[in-house]
Amino acid sequence: MLLETDASRNKPSSYIPLCGSDNSCGGLWCPRKGGKYSCISMTCDIQEDCPKLVRCKDSPGPYCMEGFCTC
């Protein structure tokens, strides 16, 4: 029996967005193409979901709070 994993789709951490927080943003403040930033929301079920989706700049985290990743 062959077990298939997602290992082939794993990307280095440099491909995971480096986000932060902003007082006017209720989600994550993340860079977009062209150097602009935008407020985005990433859902999560468990704490281990968030580090696969986002990295946090200048703050601990990311962590899952009330179903959303936050820094």
UniProtKB/Swiss-Prot annotation:
Disulfide bonds join C44-C64, C50-C69, C56-C71. The keyword Disulfide bond applies. Keywords: Antimicrobial, Disulfide bond, Fungicide, Plant defense. It comes from the Eukaryota. One of its GO terms (biological process) is defense response to fungus. Belongs to the DEFL family. This is Defensin-like protein 292. It comes from Arabidopsis thaliana. The lineage of its organism: Eukaryota, Viridiplantae, Streptophyta, Embryophyta, Tracheophyta.
